[in-house]
């Protein structure tokens, strides 16, 4: 999902690097902290692409989290995913307590083949760790001509509508669809009001958040990101009066990415503790090949309409 490179002012002592250079540097960092070459390459590509596309909360900001989980032994950086060909339209991968992205990489070819043969296929990843951007998981499928939809649950850090205790993860959804003559249509969004990483960035910078984003440890609304991180929780997306929408979608993802595939819910995995012990969770990815209608043509038309929908004074980036 490439975005135009913004102009970034820099001073003496700093320098700009290309995405390829950043990816190579990150690969070396992961290798030095004990991952296999395969795992290092996949994680570096994910972080570099997020940084390139402007998602700072999921780019190099995530590196300390990756390294702390490796140093503590909580995640196995040498894990070799076990791919199971379960049924004509179903693939299961045991990530073996490794990161989810290498597990997806190991099963991608089989999932694409099944989707093309059967029109649709589902991939379930169990026993994995995933706290990166989700769109890099789905975009490659769209570039192969498939429609892809992914769900993942995470650490319990979101209060359901009307509740007072963190029950859900940020539980993102990612979608990608091919377009003739252009980049795929891709989105990746949390079902919380804001990504957890963005709260961490706001706290570091001393910024406040808009109303309706979180609560403190007493369940009271707060705009202070530090209070949210210090025993508080995020709220579902939807705003002060419609957060039930985000809460409902998050419930769905808990079930789809948890017990439906034999894995844990966010609550079962344990709440985020601010340290290296990030939770294990499940990850679902659905690939679909549409052969009965001019899907690509419709996608081009819709993409064109979306691009020209904003007011000229507020264009898309």
Language model feature labels by segment:
Residues 2-9, 13-18, 22-25, 255, ...:
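Catalytic-core signal marking the mid-to-C-terminal active-site face
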Residues 35-42, 57-60, 262-276, 297, ...:
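Flexible, glycine/charged-enriched surface loops at secondary-structure junctions
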Residues 58-112:
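Active-site cofactor/substrate anionic-group-binding motifs, chiefly glycine-
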Residues 90-180:
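A generic, well-ordered mixed alpha/beta core segment in the N-terminal half of proteins
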Residues 157-227:
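Phosphate/diphosphate-binding glycine-rich loops and adjacent basic-rich segments that engage nucleotide
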Residues 232-288:
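Internal helical hairpin/lid segments
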Residues 289-295, 305-312:
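Alpha-helix boundary/capping motif
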């Amino acid at each position: 999902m490439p975005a135009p490179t913004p102009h970034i002012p820099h001073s003496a002592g700093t320098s700009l690097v290309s995405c390829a250079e950043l990816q190579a540097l990150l690969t070396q960092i992961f290798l030095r902290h004990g991952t296999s070459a395969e795992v290092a390459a996949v994680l570096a590509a994910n972080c570099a692409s997020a940084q390139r596309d402007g998602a700072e909360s999921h780019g190099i900001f995530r590196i300390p989290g990756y390294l702390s989980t490796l140093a503590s032994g909580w995640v196995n950086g040498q894990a070799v995913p076990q791919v199971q060909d379960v049924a004509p339209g179903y693939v299961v991968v045991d990530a073996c307590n490794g990161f989810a992205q290498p597990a997806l990489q190991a099963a991608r070819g089989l999932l694409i083949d099944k989707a093309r043969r059967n029109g649709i296929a589902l991939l379930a990843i169990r026993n994995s760790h995933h706290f990166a951007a989700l769109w890099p998981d789905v975009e490659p499928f769209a570039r192969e001509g498939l429609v892809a939809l992914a769900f993942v649950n995470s650490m319990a850090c979101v209060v359901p509508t009307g509740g007072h205790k963190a029950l859900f993860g940020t539980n993102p959804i990612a979608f990608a669809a091919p377009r003739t003559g252009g980049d795929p249509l891709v989105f990746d969004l949390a079902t919380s009001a804001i990504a957890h990483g963005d709260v961490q960035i706001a706290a570091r910078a001393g910024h406040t958040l808009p109303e309706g984003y979180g609560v403190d440890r007493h369940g009271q609304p707060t705009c202070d990101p530090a209070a949210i991180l210090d025993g508080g929780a995020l709220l579902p997306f939807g705003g002060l009066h419609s957060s039930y929408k985000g809460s409902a979608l998050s419930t769905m993802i808990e079930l789809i990415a948890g017990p439906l595939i034999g894995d844990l819910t966010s609550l079962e995995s344990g709440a985020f503790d601010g340290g290296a012990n990030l939770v294990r969770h499940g990850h679902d990815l659905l690939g679909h090949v549409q052969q009965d209608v001019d899907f690509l043509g419709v996608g081009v038309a819709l993409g064109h309409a979306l691009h020209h929908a904003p007011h000229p004074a507020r264009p898309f980036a």
